A protein has these predicted regions:
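HhH-family (HhH-GPD) DNA N-glycosylase catalytic core used in base-excision repair
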Residues: 1-602
């Protein structure tokens, strides 16, 4: 989005937004007013400026570069981030995700350009043309946002605020605050209200996390609690805490839900300069920059999903604190239950992890890839081929032959992962959903999601499930969240009232009940909900077809006899093609027979 003036396309729509003071658009663009020299968020309560005095910018950094300062009344820097950087997968969006993660502060513009595969000059041209500001200005705006939050929400000294926000000197910090906000750091701090202050222990930081509502905190904390690695993570229905490695050393954080459904972050850091990176990763973990009203509106247009959306407004799809850890957790969770995956992950942490002295109570850091590559086979349990695949992936992450992160191109990341032994479409796409925040990922091989679809009266066979869900693009990741929450196996994640509301929209059938048996026997959802079709080769009968075993055989016989869903039949007859099909040149890598808890791959 280049600067938008009164005669440019899109100006009228944005001007209507600021006339209505629509909070849904906060963080998606800023309004610069030439007559006052300030820029505001779309919902600013001040009088709407005249059209001829208005210019719209995609980012606050672009407004800074054009000579504007932030409005003291609406504080545009305190708005949630733009959801566009997750919806879009182009180089600009990838750059914005990496800038938020602190890459420019740690590696400079050359480091950012290298990660994206561009020269520094070309990347600067791209960002300036699209956003009105280059990478240095965008990183500076991000530092200013972090500094404002610390000045208003903590009692840290100005020096600590400066270095926590990523500034290299107190002078640079003071000059930036003055240019962006039009006041000194002490004056900005004096404007805070008593409500923004909280009592914290020595060495801790406590901040509010801006959220674009509504937000399904019940589902988020239930999800986190269900998948918490013992010793590394812990959670209940109102909070989630864990320890994590950051560039400057280990850190501990806790996100908690206040009575008004707002979220607060409490943290302890080895290096204060990691705070901006921590905030960015926590926001991604809790999907706080999503546009829930737009997502809910799009999904609710389909009558089959409307009741589920009404029962759980503001659903979120959790991201990942650490990309390498996310991949290894997903691989460990292949074809086993969530409980079994947590047990194995907890054993890894207990035997190979390091104590995290930064935490307020004893906790352990999840072992890095290099340690798992060296000693993982001593601890991991399960089919030998799968364990070797996990260790090989850890080795590739450790030596740099495999790199994944939030700045990846989605298609390229998927191709790299599928080239690894033991990684199939489910794992590759699940990692893309969690690490990149891709809003349009469907997992046809996910048993729990298909069980949830059956509960909602939707096709639950992989082909029908894929074909029907195509109409939900580009929000299929959020549809997956609704499918997961509709599955019987996840009902314990929600409070009794929430469970009753979710159950009221389900339409169980005899066929769905059989699928539920499979889902409960195999998986529970999320990190590890489903078998990856390429993680293990199924047993084969004389005909060469997969041979179902145990309860799966009963389910297979029942599904073979059951009539096809009318919705599925209509979708397939319409010529729908599964969007998540793997490239033809990438072949499944057979490993071993399924273990006792795995389902025969479809």
């Amino acid at each position: 989005m280049t600067p938008t003036t009164a005669d440019a396309p899109g100006f009228t729509e944005r001007y209507r937004v600021i006339q209505s003071r629509d909070r849904r658009f906060d963080g998606q663009f800023v309004t610069a007013v030439r007559s006052t020299g300030i820029y505001c968020r779309p919902s600013c309560p001040a009088r709407t400026p005249k059209e001829e005095n208005v210019t719209f910018y995609a980012t606050s950094a672009a407004a800074h570069e054009a000579g504007y300062r932030a409005c003291k009344r609406c504080l545009p820097e305190a708005a949630p981030g733009s959801p566009l950087w997750d919806v879009r997968g182009d180089v600009v969006a990838r750059a914005m995700r990496l800038i938020a993660d602190g890459v420019v502060d740690r590696e400079g513009v050359p480091g950012l350009a290298r990660r994206l595969g561009y020269s520094s000059r070309h990347l600067t041209r791209l960002l300036s043309a699209e956003l009105g500001a280059g990478p240095l200005a965008l990183a500076r705006a991000h530092r200013a946002h972090t500094a404002r939050a610390l000045l208003v929400g903590t009692d840290l000294s100005s020096a600590d605020v400066a270095f926590s926000a990523g500034f290299s000197s107190i002078r640079q910090f003071s000059e930036t605050i003055g240019e962006v906000f039009g006041m000194t750091p002490s004056a900005l701090r004096s404007r805070r209200s008593a409500a923004t202050r909280t009592e914290v222990a020595a060495g801790e930081i406590d901040l509010a996390l801006p959220v674009r509502g509504p937000i399904d905190t019940v589902g988020l904390f239930g999800w986190m609690r269900a998948h918490a690695i013992p010793g590394v993570e812990e959670g209940d229905d109102r909070s989630f805490a864990r320890v994590v490695r950051l560039p400057g050393g280990p850190a501990w954080f806790e996100v908690r839900r206040a009575d008004d459904d707002k979220l607060r972050l409490r943290a302890r850091l080895t290096a204060l300069a990691d705070l901006g990176t921590l905030i960015a990763r926590v926001r991604r973990l809790f999907d706080l920059d999503a546009d829930p009203l737009a997502i809910d509106d799009a999904l609710a247009r389909h009558p089959e999903l409307a009741p589920a959306v009404a029962a759980i407004p503001g659903v979120r799809v959790p991201g990942a604190m650490d990309a390498d850890e996310m991949l290894l957790r997903a691989m460990i969770g292949q074809q086993i239950s969530v409980a079994s995956a947590r047990t194995m992950q907890g054993r890894l942490a207990a035997e190979l992890g390091e104590p995290a002295s930064v935490a307020p109570e004893p906790m352990t850091l999840f072992p890095p890839p290099a340690v798992i590559a060296e000693r993982g086979l001593e601890v991991l349990r399960g089919p030998a081929a799968r364990m070797r695949a996990i260790v090989e992936a850890a080795g590739a992450l450790a030596d740099g032959s495999l790199e994944i992160g939030p700045g990846d191109d989605g298609a390229e990341q998927r191709e790299r992962l599928l080239a690894m032994r033991g990684i199939g479409p489910w794992t590759a796409d699940y990692v893309r959903m969690r690490v990149l925040g891709d809003p349009d990922v469907l997992l046809p091989g996910d048993v729990a999601a298909r069980a949830g679809a059956a509960q909602l009266g939707l096709p639950s066979d992989p082909a029908g499930f894929t074909a029907w869900s195509q109409r939900l693009a580009p929000w299929r990741s959020y549809a997956m969240a609704h499918y997961w929450y509709a599955a019987p196996v996840t009902q314990a994640w929600r409070s009794p009232a929430e469970t009753a509301a979710a159950a009221a929209v389900a339409r169980p059938s005899r066929r769905a009940a059989v699928v539920d048996v499979v889902a409960n026997d195999v998986v529970a959802a999320v990190d590890d909900h489903a078998p990856d079709p390429d993680a293990a080769a199924p047993a084969r009968g004389a005909s060469g077809a997969p041979t179902p075993r145990g309860s799966h055989a009963a389910a297979a016989r029942h599904q073979a006899a059951a009539p096809a869903s009318p919705v599925a039949a209509a979708s397939v007859s319409a010529g729908a093609v599964p969007a998540a099909a793997a490239p033809a040149t990438l072949r499944p890598v057979p490993t071993t027979l399924p273990d006792a808890e795995s389902e025969t791959p479809a």
